Amino acid sequence: MATPKAKVSKSRRDKRRAQFTARSKAAETVTCPNCGEPTLPHRACRHCGHYRGRAVTKKSSNS
């Protein structure tokens, strides 16, 4: 297996991780077909609790 030639500092490590998070979160959002709120793909809606047409978490049904 490959081994690192030098220790990666905490600052350099955190800068690399910050770029990944910024790109992945901002680019991919879809609208929930049940309530219309933006949500992450392939996950239950945080506002209404629906996923693929089913209520998977208990939320208020006032949407």
Curated annotation (Swiss-Prot):
Pfam families assigned: Ribosomal_L32p
GO biological process, one term: translation
Keyword annotations from UniProtKB, A to Z: Ribonucleoprotein, Ribosomal protein
GO MF annotation, one: structural constituent of ribosome
Domain of life: Bacteria
UniProt region (Disordered), positions on chain: 1-23
Biased composition (Basic residues): 7-18
Signal sequence range: none
Entry protein name: Large ribosomal subunit protein bL32
Lineage: Bacteria, Pseudomonadati, Chlorobiota, Chlorobiia, Chlorobiales
